[in-house]
């Protein structure tokens, strides 16, 4: 390593900046026309900023709160379940600048450094915590979609990560990336921006369609939009002795769960198992991870909620055998079965083609309809897009330290038969359309990043 590299990096002697690929990226970009990023942004603190730690006061009533985004939820596809930060605090002088605006670039700046998201139209009015750095591009100087694609590329990510400091919890600050060189790529910038914007629009449209599907189930079945503000609330109730022969825990018989069951019965509900829905859970086994060519893509219960679906690791093929109880199929309903109630447990994801063939973690339940009268999109919409479905899933949680959803209890949940077959197919079509849009969104974003990388490699031509 030449000593000039040390000089150019503030005489840093830790190995991070020199082994991450940042130096090579800077050397390549030095041969091109570039502009420091701070000259391409505008707004609070020059357009690149995070915040200071603050006391978080959460509320339950949406009228008095704003959705609050954290580093753990930044990359999720569905932001409708975010916690609510006090609106009074959020709109104060101290925190008002943490509001997210469309076309901002959001970067995690503490812990896992350099995870990024492009602020979509449905993120307007959401506040973020202090560990998410915001980059606000100046539209008169640069296209926001292009800048995002560049920062996500194999040239941008290493340079962002190279500025990290801290031995235990790593951080970056705005000044560490302010002078990051941004190459000017001519027409490719507009093309990359268009791809990123189309990807964002497809993601927003997908969310609207899923919301429409859930509302349709509620309307047809006469369900309220919201049964309770949380999965578990402090309350008291009574239950028939015949109903406590299998479950004696009070949370299973809480009044919200009882109400959810009652209105499902009123909608002529029958058990999922009687409706031809099969359930699968992966065996608990020693997990040996290998290179891609020797393994099957593996995903955890946290990974299924991500906007971008990619293998986290590859599970050794020989461990899986010929039995495919571990396999995710397209159109499965995936339910997170472990965790704390109020978190991801009981939340579900629609398996579009991106997840087909993945090996599922033992912490994921897979529900697979086999009866055409109950199409997969309808099953997903009832369980995962209505509060009634969620409350019925959450009530089945058992265990004191780390609750889990028993598969047999989940298959006993009643699904409404009130919707006519044509209405069920309509809901099914909506869910499938939403899945295709999410797949399209990911494909467009990958294309944009590849376009930027290819243009840089060709010298900006």
PLM region spans:
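A short beta-sheet element
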Residues: 96, 110-149, 326, 330-383
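Non-catalytic DNA-recognition/assembly elements of restriction-modification systems
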Residues: 1-54, 186-286, 419-461
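Short, positively charged
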Residues: 144-171, 377-399
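Sequence-specific dsDNA recognition surfaces
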Residues: 35-57, 72-102, 270-286, 302-330
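Short, surface-exposed loop/turn microsegments at beta-strand edges and helix-strand junctions
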Residues: 57-66, 81-86, 98-100, 118-130, ...
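Short hydrophobic-aromatic micro-motifs
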Residues: 67-70, 100, 105-108, 297-300, ...
